[in-house]
Amino acid sequence: RGLGDVYKRQELNCEPTGEFAHNPEPLPENLTEIAAAVVREKADLGVVVDPDVDRLAFVSEDGSMFVEEYTLVAVADYVLSHRKGDTVSNLSSSRALRDVTERRGGRYHASAVGEVNVVAKMKEVGAVIGGEGNGGVIYPELHYGRDALVGVALFLTYLAQTGLRMTALRATYPAYYASKNKIALTPAIDVDKVLREIKDRYAGEQVN
């Protein structure tokens, strides 16, 4: 509701009833309703946040997902266009942030998974923007925490300045693909042994 000079806004599932209309995780399989609404209403974009408003995803004008991995990438691109500096994301994030950071003359740093680890690394290197590949944007100019509303403001500002449609903006970034699957671990699986074997097997390779 605080989007300012927006020509037309339509809300979906914004009333706090105590029950989620669908799985609240902002993943493509859970966002079919808003994707269809964006196309039906000929909207410029759709904005999606999770219940505690620390994850942010966008839907492009054609109903496709902007992909939450690229939320941070686009926001960082905007921030770095105005202020040179370094960026941080965790190891479960797209390499596209590294590409954008280096293109803007900065240095990318990776952290262990977890918001607390990202924040610690950001403070260590003095990063100007950081976050996680799940759509979490951390902008230290305001505070050291994932904040979807900050991400919305930065993203919309950048989109307005570029004059691009969502799909066109997305096309300006490298296309990387990731499969994030949860693996059930049992006591019979020696995780440390598996990691050691992977390290040994690829010892001669350059890991990035």
Model-identified regions with their sequence ranges:
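Short, small-residue-biased leader/transition segments that mark boundaries at the very start
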Residues: 2-7
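Short hydrophobic/aromatic-enriched beta-strand-loop microsegments
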Residues: 8-13, 65-70, 105-113
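N-terminal small/polar loop signature for handling phosphorylated ligands or for N-terminal nucleophile
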Residues: 9-59
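Short, charged, surface-exposed secondary-structure boundary motifs
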Residues: 17-24, 77-79, 118-122
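Phosphate-binding and adjacent anionic-ligand microenvironments
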Residues: 45, 83-208
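Short glycine/threonine-rich catalytic loop with a Thr-x-Gly-x-Asp
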Residues: 49-51, 65-70, 143-146
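Short Gly/Thr/Asp-enriched flexible loops that form oxyanion-binding sites at enzyme active sites
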Residues: 54-72, 97-98
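Short, acidic/small-residue loops that bind anionic groups at enzyme active sites
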Residues: 65-82, 86, 112-114
